Design a protein with these regions (language model features):
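Bacterial Sec-dependent N-terminal signal peptides
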Residues: 1-20
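Extracellular glycan-recognition regions
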Residues: 18-222
């Protein structure tokens, strides 16, 4: 029994490799269809990201790519804060999230993001759409919502202009999103559209109308 116990301990401690604390170094941050700056907000070192206003389509590769990341399976954790730009339209929701498994050409990636204005909206339908999964280029939110209503979005409590902790666990074709240290995932996706073997970089993603901030990021590969 002692040998079995020791073996279990070794297995559990080696399931994940060492956690990588992401340092915000400009030479390792590559903006793609966004503007980027390093700032301090509420005492935290953060990356500020705003979508290029000439990009009218939604669910696009509008992110800051972390060039020193190569991610397939594991855990991504980050604190995000979202504000609405002064020129944001009524349909702006504070879209902010994480792109992962980004290919070298930025033409394919998976994504999980949040809509902070929906978290406490006076509409149950909007609350039910506080989180979102999509896969670029073929499975944007509108297609997923039409073909599988409610399956790729869900409710979570959140608001604008406050730090929100996101944790994404990825394993093969499955991804789980946890918000603000929830014990259970608020969104569960069992069929990542790029498949179990996709891998690539991680990106700090925003969409239309958002002034987004990212802080305290760490990545643990499996």
């Amino acid at each position: 029994m002692k040998f079995i116990a020791i073996g279990f301990i070794l297995l559990s401690t080696t399931s994940y490799s060492q956690t990588q604390i992401i340092q915000w170094q400009k030479d390792k941050l590559l903006p793609n269809k966004v503007s980027m700056s390093l700032e301090r907000i509420n005492g935290n070192e953060a990356v500020r990201v705003v979508k290029d206003s000439t990009i009218k389509e939604v669910d696009e590769p509008t992110f800051v790519k972390l060039t020193d990341t190569d991610f397939k399976n594991g855990i991504i954790e980050v604190n995000v804060l979202s504000r609405l730009l002064k020129n944001a339209t009524e349909t702006a929701r504070g879209f902010i999230g994480i792109a992962f498994r980004i290919n070298a050409q930025n033409t394919a990636f998976e994504n999980m993001y949040i809509r902070p204005t929906n978290g406490r909206a006076e509409s149950q339908l909007r609350r039910n759409r506080a989180t979102q999964y999509f896969s670029f280029p073929d499975f944007k939110f509108d297609r997923l919502r039409k073909e599988a209503p409610g399956e790729y979005e869900s409710y979570a409590d959140m608001a604008l202009n406050e730090w929100i902790h996101l944790r994404i666990e990825v394993n093969g074709k499955q991804a789980k999103l946890y918000v603000n240290h929830s014990k259970q995932p608020v969104l569960l996706v069992n069929d990542l559209k790029l498949g179990a073997d996709a891998s690539g970089a991680i990106g700090l993603w925003v969409d239309v109308g958002t002034e987004g901030f990212f802080s305290d990021m760490k990545v643990t590969k499996r």
